[in-house]
């Protein structure tokens, strides 16, 4: 299910969360989510440089990924905090806040993470 080319990115986030919650496999969940985060950033860079077309990225696919990106970040931060990987959570949150400087909730969580929680 994870390797299907046509699979929806939001479904993969759900699979990652299932690995964490139901199978108690934080490492697999993090691997899935970090791969997705990297894939998103690469696609974003490609779209900025090359735009949309059949060979690079279709608008519908990009819209699905854009919609899913906050869920990827949220899930990563949650799992990192739950597994006491606060430095990793801080890195992810710092990147998010830099991209979304008006997100007060993310800033609050970042402050909590920086203070050890």
Each model region followed by its residue ranges:
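Structural motif corresponding to the intra-repeat A-B loop/turn of tetratricopeptide repeats
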Residues: 22-23, 83, 117
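Residue at a conserved register position within TPR or TPR-like alpha-solenoid repeats
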Residues: 19-20, 80, 114
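TPR alpha-solenoid repeat register
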Residues: 11, 45-46, 72, 106
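Flexible helix-coil transition and linker loops at the boundaries of alpha-helical arrays
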Residues: 1-8, 37-67
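Structural register within alpha-helical repeat arrays
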Residues: 15-19, 76, 110
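Structural signature of alpha-solenoid helical repeat junctions
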Residues: 7, 25-28, 61-71, 102-105, ...
């Amino acid at each position: 299910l994870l390797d299907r080319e046509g699979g929806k990115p939001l479904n993969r986030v759900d699979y990652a969360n299932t690995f964490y919650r139901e199978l108690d496999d934080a490492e697999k969940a993090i691997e899935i989510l970090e791969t997705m985060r990297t894939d998103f950033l690469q696609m974003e860079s490609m779209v900025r440089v090359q735009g949309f077309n059949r060979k690079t990225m279709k608008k519908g696919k990009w819209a699905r990924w854009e919609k899913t990106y906050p869920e990827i970040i949220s899930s990563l931060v949650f799992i990192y905090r739950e597994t006491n990987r606060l430095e990793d959570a801080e890195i992810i949150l710092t990147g998010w806040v830099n991209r979304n400087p008006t997100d007060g909730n993310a800033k609050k969580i970042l402050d909590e993470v920086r203070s050890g929680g």
